[in-house]
Amino acid sequence: MFRNTLRTFPRPATPSLPTSSHSPIARASLSKSPLFVLSLVLVCIFFLSFLSHPDPSARKLQWPGLFPSPSPSVIHTKDLFLERALNATSEAFREICPSAGDPVHLDPDLTEAQKKRYLPLKRSKRGRYLLVTNTRQIEAHLPDLLNTLIVLLRYLAPEHLAVSILEGPSSDCTQKAIEQVLKPMLDDQGLESAWTRIETGESKIDWGKHNRIEKIAELRNTALAPLWQGEGDQKWEDEIEAVVFFNDVYLHAADILELVYQHVKNGAGITTAMDWWKKRPEYYYDVWVGRTIDTGDLFYPIDNPWWSPSSDLFPNSPNSRNAYSRLEPFQVFSSWNALAVLSPKPFLPPHNVRFRRGDVEKGECAASECTLIATDFWKAGFGKVAVVPSVQLAYERDVAKDIIEDVGKQKEQLGWIDGVPPEHLDDKIEWSTKPPKKVRCHPWPEVNGLSANVWEETRWVQPWLE
């Protein structure tokens, strides 16, 4: 549509100058005229706007375009059924969110090698993988999320999935897109309503009245509640194979499948990706949550009361550092990193683990709700926590593109082919059954509000309270 529209606009005629202006004296006089300068500026702006096609989802200063951005390209796959579903959903999404950008992942499908690798996840004896998220304001992320869900439904089949989404509040098109595009798409792809719970339009939170960790834990528990509550008359707890909890990041189906594959293969309690705030230079995002298995230290120890670049990860954990450099899964004490696969068993009787804030009255350090989940998994006997560094995620579009490029090059150098690692980099994790003797903690201040500086205080504490 854009190309046809573009041809209907006449190219602006170049204004002719008076004949006398060709003389050096006339040109000098004219160049000093305010009207001439203004005209020149306007012509430059016009041509810059003519050439510019800003990306609405990119969070950076961009030159405004004269015309709308080009329509997204049609997705082509070998699977025609998948191709139709992807393109039909994309078209429906564009009608709801016309200003949204394209997906970051231009090819949402799996490679043939990946399809072969993940076959064990779709065997008939397998249960369902419960996809869970708390989300808001994700217009930019929705194209990739929609594609991811469609590919997972097509590859795993609807009988192997369940979905729980808690949204809001959003001021962009997120709520409308979830209600009018995502939910109908799940129905069209065969996921029964008994295996979906989608709640939108959550009220705005007055953070001045809430402890951040306590409130976020409450929201996570609400999103996860169908695991133990079910939906309608349908019980979920007996059929959920694994919980896949994700944040507002740019996803690809292979990200989720690789994490679930490693989780099942290694018999883990929690398996996570890596997430980044920035990639150039590197700022590891979930630094407040992650702890190493050997020393209990941060993945990137911060010695100053502020966040600093983290290109030198795991300086105090040689085994973790070596595995990370080779993109091999490795054990940690705790991690979340935007995408976490969790065993459902600790959330169910007799353990009944929940996201929570620290019990300060008992002397427990006020850690993140995600650190405390790992702590409670350890305590319940599910302390096999792993990071899969080949899956790296970003919250910002530009960072996601940097990751795709940088990790893609690293995988190529390491011998990955079609998204699958070489055999010598695909061993099982050798688990330690013991946690670190002490774990580093930066307590959240006992004040209400959304933000605080946790780096001002450092404690070394027992892995968990008895």
Swiss-Prot record:
Taken from the record's topology, the Lumenal segments are 55-466
Q: How is the cofactor bound?
A: Divalent metal cations. Mg(2+), Mn(2+) or Co(2+) can be used.
Presence of the UniProt keyword Membrane in the record: yes
Q: Tell me its cofactors.
A: Mg(2+); Mn(2+); Co(2+)
| Any one GO MF annotation of this record | glycosyltransferase activity
Q: Tell me yes or no: is tRNA-binding among this UniProt entry's keywords.
A: no
Pathway, according to UniProt? Protein modification; protein glycosylation
**EC numbers, comma separated:** 2.4.1.-
An example GO biological process term is: protein glycosylation
Listed transmembrane segments: 34-54
Instruction: Note the coiled coil stretches, chain numbering.
Output: none
What does the function comment of this entry state?
Answer: Responsible for addition of mannose residues in an alpha-1,3 linkage to a polymannosly precursor. May be involved in synthesis of capsule glucuronoxylomannan.
Which protein are we looking at?
Answer: Alpha-1,3-mannosyltransferase CMT1
Which species is the source of this protein?
Cryptococcus neoformans var. neoformans serotype D (strain JEC21 / ATCC MYA-565) (Filobasidiella neoformans)
Supply the source organism's classification.
Eukaryota, Fungi, Dikarya, Basidiomycota, Agaricomycotina
